[in-house]
Regions:
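Short amphipathic alpha-helix that is part of the acyltransferase structural core
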Residues: 1-29
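A short helix-loop-beta-strand connector motif used in the catalytic cores of GNAT acetyltransferases and
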Residues: 34-47, 51-54, 99
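Conserved beta-strand in the GNAT
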Residues: 45, 51-60, 66-69
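A structural microfeature
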Residues: 54, 127-130
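Conserved acetyl-CoA binding element of GNAT-fold acetyltransferases
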Residues: 64-83, 140
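C-terminal "cap" of GNAT-fold acetyltransferases
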Residues: 68, 131-148
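Conserved acetyl-CoA-binding loop-helix of GNAT-fold acetyltransferases
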Residues: 79-95, 116, 120
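Conserved beta-strand-loop-alpha-helix junction that forms the acyl-donor binding cleft
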Residues: 94, 100-119, 124, 132-133
């Protein structure tokens, strides 16, 4: 497994293929959001034997604060522990290099397994955001704080 800098083509390929869970597929209302994820040195892609496995990164919101994101291919299940560790290390590295003191994520409420994932990343639950999604689904706000 190797990590490479994220490219728009990686995200598009992941979305066109089978995802690890279809709940991971963004709502069509978001349109082509992939270019907004492109921030130099703030995203990466995991590749195994030439296959895209996952991509993750942090979208900067304002100074010191970013929003974490993740896209996993259907083959992520074969590498779930390795991917989890790589994503945690990668997000923490990005946060440190970019001087972020808050990294947050919005995780679907109807996908309870994501709470375990967020805890593994070192995040704490901050609350439920009702009708947050473009499709009016509820989301949970999770965040990692450094020095606050």
């Amino acid at each position: 497994m190797r990590l490479v800098p994220f490219e728009i083509a990686h995200g598009e390929a992941l979305l066109e293929a089978d995802l690890n869970d279809d709940r991971n597929r963004p709502a069509p209302e978001f349109g082509n959001f992939m270019p907004t994820l492109m921030h130099e040195d703030m995203a990466f892609t995991a590749i195994d034997n030439g296959y895209l496995v996952a991509a993750a990164g942090i979208f900067p919101l304002w100074e010191g604060v970013g929003e974490a994101w993740f896209l996993g291919a259907s083959r992520v299940g074969r590498h779930q522990f390795r991917i989890a560790k790589l994503v945690r290390e990668g997000l923490l590295r990005i946060a440190e290099e970019q001087g972020l003191w808050r990294v947050q994520a919005a995780l679907r409420s109807d996908w309870p397994e994501l709470a375990r994932w967020a805890r593994f990343l070192g995040m704490k639950h901050e609350g439920t955001m009702r009708c947050y999604g473009a499709n009016k689904l509820d989301y949970e706000r999770w965040a990692w704080l450094d020095g606050c």
